[in-house]
């Protein structure tokens, strides 16, 4: 793990934003995580309607591009299990992965994602757009 990896320090920051967070359970989360966080984090998936688009958000260790959830034509599957950033249109859906802020893979920088004005942007910590896709 990176030297800066400090999940306990992130807890107060996340709790301060609890009304703005939709979270899903990852493959390493446990009930103790739910005990310290003030918003739900144990759901396997979350379906969001943003700007008229349906996002199926999941961690990705169960549902992913190799084991698709019940998507409709044009839906967006977003997951982060692999820690590898992706933003690509598939035949019947769009696949998004914001990468990882703490343990990025495949030589990528630490990244996060923003969805704004119909554009999914993956950014590094300096705010540079690393990858984007218009949805």
Describe these PLM feature segments.
Residues 14, 48, 57-59, 99:
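Generic structural signal for conserved hydrophobic packing positions in ordered secondary structure
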Residues 48, 131-135:
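Generic detection of short hydrophobic beta-strand segments and adjacent strand-loop junctions
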Residues 23, 56-57:
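Short catalytic-loop micro-motif centered on adjacent basic/acidic residues
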Residues 1-50:
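Core catalytic region of metal-dependent phosphoesterases/phosphodiesterases
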Residues 54, 61-132:
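Conserved beta-sheet core of the metallophosphoesterase superfamily
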């Amino acid at each position: 793990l990176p030297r800066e990896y400090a999940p306990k320090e992130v807890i107060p920051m996340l709790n301060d934003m609890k009304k703005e967070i939709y979270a899903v359970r990852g493959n390493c989360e446990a009930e103790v995580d739910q005990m310290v966080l003030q918003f739900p984090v144990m759901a396997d998936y979350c379906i969001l309607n943003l700007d008229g688009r349906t996002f199926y958000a999941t961690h990705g260790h169960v549902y992913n591009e190799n084991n698709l959830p019940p998507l409709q034509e044009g839906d967006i599957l977003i997951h982060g299990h692999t820690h590898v950033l992706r933003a690509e249109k598939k035949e019947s859906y769009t696949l998004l992965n914001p990468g990882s802020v703490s343990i990025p893979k495949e030589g990528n920088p630490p990244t996060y994602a923003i969805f704004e004005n119909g554009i999914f942007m993956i950014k590094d910590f300096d705010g540079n757009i690393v990858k984007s896709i218009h949805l």
